[in-house]
Curated annotation (Swiss-Prot):
Gene of this entry: Hmgb2
Species classification: Eukaryota, Metazoa, Chordata, Craniata, Vertebrata
Name of this chain's protein: High mobility group protein B2
Record key words, sorted: Acetylation, Chemotaxis, Chromosome, Cytoplasm, Disulfide bond, DNA recombination, DNA-binding, Immunity, Inflammatory response, Innate immunity, Nucleus, Oxidation, Phosphoprotein, Repeat, Secreted, Transcription, Transcription regulation
Subcellular location: Nucleus; Chromosome; Cytoplasm; Secreted
Positions of region (Disordered): 71-102, 162-210
Description of its domains: Both, HMG box 1 and HMG box 2, show antimicrobial activity.
Source organism superkingdom: Eukaryota
InterPro entries, A to Z: HMG_box_dom, HMG_box_dom_sf, HMG_boxA_CS, HMGB
Sites bearing Cysteine sulfonic acid (-SO3H), chain numbering: 23, 45, 106
UniProt feature, compositional bias: Acidic residues: 187-210
Organism: Mus musculus (Mouse)
Cysteine pairs bridged by disulfides in the record: 23-45
Disruption phenotype annotation: Viable, with severe reduction of sperm production in males.
GO biological process: cell chemotaxis; cellular response to lipopolysaccharide; defense response to Gram-negative bacterium; defense response to Gram-positive bacterium; DNA recombination; DNA topological change; extrinsic apoptotic signaling pathway via death domain receptors; inflammatory response to antigenic stimulus
Length: 210
């Protein structure tokens, strides 16, 4: 999918997200020219939040309640656009295409970015993640690449078993097309099926990111 619906209400923020936003504003006022070390900043915010009293947290909880009320009110009046993607139905039992190393990295780091930049758009979040990934050293990327390789290996085994099962079931149902052309066309059909699966899964991954 491309960009999400611009008319969709902005998501509600938690009390902690409001607290982090306040911390960022304070930091910008004190150090307008310095850049923020994301990992250190997140750690300091988390530690500070844990030591705060219930009374200190209450103002952020009030902000979160107000924002939730705003979100619920806007969602009642929100009408999602009609005629969204209507593809063919996918077999829910089909193995899901494995994520890439970059996708695993994004899944891990996206929540942190949302906390630090609560108002950031989907496109800007993706851009930020891309920049963070490119700054990672080969050593830092290695755990994600190893995990992705294992998931890919498992997927290849699962999809082979799934297709073998599908063929045996199709055989039981009887001839669905002229037998003379079956062997010749099978490899091409498999490639077409795989391409369709990949395209649909790519779209699903983009939806998940939204």
């Amino acid at each position: 999918m491309g960009k999400g619906d611009p008319n969709k209400p902005r998501g509600k923020m938690s009390s902690y997200a409001f607290f982090v936003q306040t911390c960022r504003e304070e930091h910008k006022k004190k150090h307008p020219d310095s850049s923020v070390n994301f990992a250190e900043f997140s750690k300091k915010c988390s530690e500070r939040w844990k030591t705060m009293s219930a009374k200190e947290k209450s103002k952020f909880e009030d902000l979160a309640k107000s924002d939730k009320a705003r979100y619920d009110r806007e969602m009642k009046n929100y009408v999602p656009p009609k005629g969204d993607k209507k593809g063919k139905k996918k077999d829910p039992n089909a193995p899901k295409r494995p994520p890439s190393a970059f996708f695993l990295f994004c899944s891990e780091n996206r929540p942190k970015i949302k906390i630090e930049h609560p108002g950031l758009s989907i496109g800007d979040t993706a851009k930020k993640l891309g920049e963070m990934w490119s700054e990672q050293s080969a050593k830092d990327k290695q755990p994600y690449e190893q995990k992705a390789a294992k998931l890919k290996e498992k997927y290849e085994k699962d999809i082979a078993a799934y297709r073998a099962k599908g063929k045996s079931e199709a055989g039981k149902k009887g001839p669905g097309r002229p037998t003379g052309s079956k062997k010749k066309n099978e490899p091409e059909d498999e490639e077409e099926e795989e391409e369709e699966e990949e395209e649909e899964d790519d779209e699903e991954e983009e939806e998940d990111e939204e």
